[in-house]
């Protein structure tokens, strides 16, 4: 686009005293606003402009009308510009011919003219260029009218128009002009007033905004300050440093936000829950929790998210992209936070410490879940059975009990599981893998939870306490079972006889009465039992018999030995 210089005279509209008196207060205010804004726009763009007298008068609040200079006529004095208006189109005749295009600066203007006597004087490029200049002007529907010819023509079979290719605005200016009665009384002033009133309202200059171009990436800006900030992306310049931690930033606004980390300032507060934030953007994201708004939708699966960052992370599920790689072991992750958490495995860092028991965790989420052991908080409740859980993941897993869903299947034996963790543990039955070893006794386990439970046998730790009787347990499952003593809950019912039990293991043992199953067999006598405890008791008989045989007691002493008591199987 051409960058011809724009002068204030190109965009200024001057009124004589007589014309100024025609304007009502609203129109005069509009004139002041447009004139001052155009002047300031040129100054802000670095255009060398000496302050015109009319601007000085406007700034002082004085009447800006100018003494009209007679006898100054342009190259085509018989023409004026007005915007298409239904009030005037009925009185003004127009003429048409095939469309032509003339270049004015860098603007391509389409115009039509079909009156022979008008062509020679008014269709030169120099005339248009003199009238419009090279600035961009929103002239969506511009009509050319001729003062001398039009009154002589009475028919309405011609139509002429001069339109720009920029059809972005259609102006409605019917209310900008005097009523018909006043217009007829002051016909000489009407044309001049009409022209300048339209120019005042709509001949607002939009100087080419893309004036400043980045030499590295060709991106354009309308302000030098924006370009300067942008160029720091390429140069890496970060001139704003935090005096607390030395971290640097490319923008002062980013430094101001960062400082709130040190000061703890959180000036942006949610009106719903009173939660405060250090940045307005964080508040905006948080408010979607209350409104439920999820404006970012995945094109693949239509899942919606409240934050664009969450959508970006989710899309990697479809693409399989894992751009964040651990430099220690090469494991890759779909987002940076997962990598940061993973790296603590290598460093052993556990920055999150429980203020009750002092236990430390590598992830903040683990600490929050752990603290619910102390508080007893279970915020996630099942709508089916009202059972509550301390973690949402546990609720999701539990709900599969009601739905019967078992989406995770073993490829070896086709056994299905409701949780992927159960599948992982099960697969170790086939592989024999026991990766979790106790450092105290060397005993190995197939899953970490079993190791954690086992280690409490060495430490004596019993973190799970019954609120009713203060009895403690090493396992949460043990506490859950114990609490049924107080509640009387018996959720496990036999589908044969209807008898109910508080423990699933008790139901399993009971059902063997109906099925006749005796899975525990003695290796010595092949006798079988329904329960492992019964088998263990029975095996002591053989142990005692072996002891008696080896010791070879005399008949007198043998009568004094206790007789083994048989167990009813």
Swiss-Prot record:
Entry-linked CDD domains: KRAB_A-box (cd07765)
Xref: Pfam families: KRAB (PF01352), zf-C2H2 (PF00096)
Keyword Ion transport: no
PROSITE patterns: KRAB (PS50805), ZINC_FINGER_C2H2_1 (PS00028), ZINC_FINGER_C2H2_2 (PS50157)
GO annotation, cellular component aspect: nucleus
Location in the cell: Nucleus
Classification via Gene3D superfamilies: 6.10.140.140, Classic Zinc Finger
Keywords per UniProt: DNA-binding, Metal-binding, Nucleus, Repeat, Transcription, Transcription regulation, Zinc, Zinc-finger
Sample GO molecular function, one term: DNA-binding transcription factor activity, RNA polymerase II-specific
GO biological process, one term: regulation of transcription by RNA polymerase II
Chain spans, region Disordered: 549-569
PANTHER family linked to this entry: GASTRULA ZINC FINGER PROTEIN XLCGF26.1-LIKE-RELATED, ZINC FINGER AND BTB DOMAIN-CONTAINING
Sequence similarity: Belongs to the krueppel C2H2-type zinc-finger protein family.
The protein, known as: Zinc finger protein 583
Gene: ZNF583
